[in-house]
Amino acid sequence: MKRLLPTLRADQTSESLISVINTIQIAAKEISFRLHQGALAGVLGSTLDENIQGETQKKLDVVANQLLKTLLLESPNVHAVASEEEDSIVESPNSGHYLVAFDPLDGSSNIDINGGVGTIFSILRKPEGEETSENMFLQPGKAQVAAGYVLYGPATMLVMTTGKAVRIYTLDQTVGEFLLTHEKAEIPKDTKEFAINMSNRRHWADPIRAYISDLLEGEEGPRGKNFNMRWNAAMVSDVHRVISRGGLFTYPWDARKPEKPFKLRLLYEAAPMAMLVEKAGGKATDGYSRLMEIVPEHIHQRVSVVMGSANEVDVCMDYHKQHPKPY
């Protein structure tokens, strides 16, 4: 089986970008080890702190963030990083040409129950001649030069693209290397699976409520077929299922907290996942517009997300076209 770095070179990826990806995979291996140690490593449970999102930090949130931040800022090819766990960007002492945004541990509420979690990352080029500031990161998803995630499940898997195919690598624990196990992930155009947090149904806007209601009616409803619902409470796990076998994943606008009507962050969650889904043949939108076209207004901006099998995303968007935006 091919290893990660030789595969990237065969794809004609630049050595500077390979260096950044290599740094991420080194951090991911350490995070994977800590996770698999579980209670033995004393890293389960929560801290007493909250991150910039107002969310209580898990101990492993802090560990994963520190690992990624430290290693990336040591890279000569990284100029600055942005993280879910950091209030603002963190500048490197080096004059690298890449910017890295990441969610160090997506789905961290699953840690204490031994559920699936993951690391999501986005790599952008530093705009030439621009002073170091948050504005450097405010680029649309289509500007990404690479995107991916690491899923820490029964196996640790790296799923990524440098703008070509979406490749899947599995960590071989015996040699400590990510080996290529899937040359080209392709999302089926049609599906009978969807993933959504149904507990928020009463707070949804009309388009998504109508869409999900029709799915639940199955063969007797307007869709004329039965659908299965899946929900892992971790974007990485739910999107990995979509990339592996198709489906639709959505975390829509809701009215629970008017000041925070969206859940997922554009820069380091929605945009990198959108790049992966599109490169695997799917579609990714906010219900109205292509996610890859949206320019962030700040690094922690949140958005509505609908992504997955292309034909099913189109159907969901048709429901949205029948109603005005709720925001």
From Swiss-Prot:
Mg(2+) 1 binds at residues 84, 103, 105. The keyword Flavoprotein does not apply. GO terms for biological process: fructose 1,6-bisphosphate metabolic process; fructose 6-phosphate metabolic process; fructose metabolic process; gluconeogenesis; sucrose biosynthetic process. This is Fructose-1,6-bisphosphatase class 1. HAMAP family: FBPase_class1. It comes from Idiomarina loihiensis (strain ATCC BAA-735 / DSM 15497 / L2-TR). One of its GO terms (molecular function) is fructose 1,6-bisphosphate 1-phosphatase activity. The lineage of its organism: Bacteria, Pseudomonadati, Pseudomonadota, Gammaproteobacteria, Alteromonadales. It catalyses: beta-D-fructose 1,6-bisphosphate + H2O = beta-D-fructose 6-phosphate + phosphate. It comes from the Bacteria. Its cofactor is Mg(2+).
